[in-house]
């Protein structure tokens, strides 16, 4: 599948004086699902270490289930697919899809305030995929374990109550713990297994440097960045010894803490590239070629490189941390890396006939509504057309609910349905 570039507005690359890059999932692409499986295994081990049941270790990472940009409901433990306006499109409790009635009972008008950070957490990044799957696994485990009583907002075990909010906090703490130690260490121990290497990368950056300035701004530490970038640019022994990776950049900034980097930022400190340690005090001298800095801000990048916001094209994978903040606060031109698009474009090509049929049915339904007079015949046609449009999992859920007492759709403290694993990413 060739790489595609989509544009929201025209961009004259000849006017770009400076190219900026994030590292993780931009210059450094991690191999999927091997990298996510590693993270997932380390998360399970960490949770067991802090007291979670050993039985959760039976779960293995399934790359077909999670997708990016799902929302975790910290109150009810549901994973939600939400559109840009806050409308709930799909929901899952563990591996069980929520019915229409269940979604309405949890979220009146099928709507949520996505910026309500007290209740909802948006799993924005590719780094969040193992975490997303873990939430489903934990809900699946505790819901099906006879030792725990299912409640609306968590699980009761004797005199102990574990809320979904505390479960969320435990997973978040585990993520922070493994990324500071275990995951980074395991990745560096076997770079070939977890990191993709593209021989075209040095060529690309070399050409960019011929026509402008190039900088790297990453949240990763220097030692990790140095190991990853050395691997990516060591295409051959001759090239590795002839040109170090730092020579491809005019400016290198690590530990940026984006999106904070695009606001007031942090103290700019220089990194000792031999030891990886930071020099004491704020760096106030002129920019030194191939030097590495820690912290700083986007304003300092512009000052050190002598460029303005509109002169910069910044390329990253995080729509919030990399793209929106740099665009809105600094006026940088931006390019979002979305690796999932390759997969989705493949599906688009494979399912072209089905998509055309859906478009035809949608147009047909609109025509019926436009000219309907309320006759029973037209209502039958409308219902038939709607059933044709429904996705398979929606039809199954609808049929299951038709066979149940309506009152059973309202989930009480002890009546949450047991999970039956589904594929959330493909359904979405």
Swiss-Prot record:
It holds the Pfam family 5_nucleotid. The gene is NT5DC4. Keywords: Hydrolase, Magnesium, Metal-binding. The active site is at 22 (nucleophile), 24 (proton donor). It comes from Homo sapiens. Belongs to the 5'(3')-deoxyribonucleotidase family. GO terms for molecular function: 5'-nucleotidase activity; metal ion binding. This is 5'-nucleotidase domain-containing protein 4. CDD domains: HAD_cN-II (cd07522). Mg(2+) binds at residues 22, 24, 317. It comes from the Eukaryota. The lineage of its organism: Eukaryota, Metazoa, Chordata, Craniata, Vertebrata.
């Amino acid at each position: 599948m060739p790489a595609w570039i989509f544009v929201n507005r025209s961009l004259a690359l000849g006017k770009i004086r400076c190219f900026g890059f994030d590292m993780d999932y931009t210059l450094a692409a991690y191999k999927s699902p091997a990298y996510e499986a590693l993270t997932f295994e380390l998360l399970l081990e960490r949770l067991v270490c802090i007291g979670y049941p050993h039985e959760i270790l039976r779960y293995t990472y399934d790359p077909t289930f999670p997708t990016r940009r799902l929302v975790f409901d910290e109150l009810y433990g549901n994973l939600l697919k939400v559109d840009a306006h806050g409308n709930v499109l799909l929901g899952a409790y563990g591996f069980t899809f929520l019915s229409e009635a269940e979604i309405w009972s949890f979220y009146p008008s099928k709507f949520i305030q996505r910026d309500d950070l007290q209740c909802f957490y948006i799993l924005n990044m590719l780094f969040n995929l193992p975490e997303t799957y873990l939430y489903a696994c934990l809900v699946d485990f505790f819901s099906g374990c006879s030792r725990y009583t299912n409640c609306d907002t968590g699980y009761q075990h004797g005199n102990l109550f574990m809320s979904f909010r505390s479960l969320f906090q435990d997973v978040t703490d585990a993520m922070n713990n493994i990324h500071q130690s275990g995951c980074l260490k395991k990745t560096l121990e076997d770079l070939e297994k977890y990191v993709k290497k593209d021989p075209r990368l040095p060529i690309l950056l070399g050409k960019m440097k011929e026509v402008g300035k190039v900088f790297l701004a990453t949240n990763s530490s220097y030692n990790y960045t140095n190991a990853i970038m050395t691997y990516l640019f060591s295409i051959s022994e001759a090239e590795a010894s002839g040109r170090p990776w730092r020579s491809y950049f005019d400016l290198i900034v690590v530990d940026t803490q984006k999106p904070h980097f695009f606001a007031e930022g942090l103290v700019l400190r220089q990194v000792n590239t031999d030891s990886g340690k930071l020099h004491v005090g704020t760096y106030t001298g002129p920019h030194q070629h191939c030097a590495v800095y820690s912290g700083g801000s986007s304003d300092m990048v512009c000052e050190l490189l002598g460029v303005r916001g509109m002169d910069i094209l910044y390329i990253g994978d995080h729509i919030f941390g990399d793209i929106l903040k740099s665009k809105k606060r600094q006026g940088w031109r931006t390019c979002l890396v979305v690796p999932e698009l390759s997969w989705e474009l493949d599906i688009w090509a494979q399912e072209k006939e089905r998509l055309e049929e859906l478009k035809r049915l949608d147009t047909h339904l609109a025509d019926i509504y436009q000219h309907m007079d309320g006759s029973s015949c037209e209502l039958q046609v409308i219902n038939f057309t709607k059933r044709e449009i429904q996705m398979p999992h929606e039809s199954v859920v609808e049929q299951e609910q038709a066979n149940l007492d309506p009152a059973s759709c309202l989930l009480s403290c002890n009546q949450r349905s047991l999970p039956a694993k589904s594929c959330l990413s493909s359904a979405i």
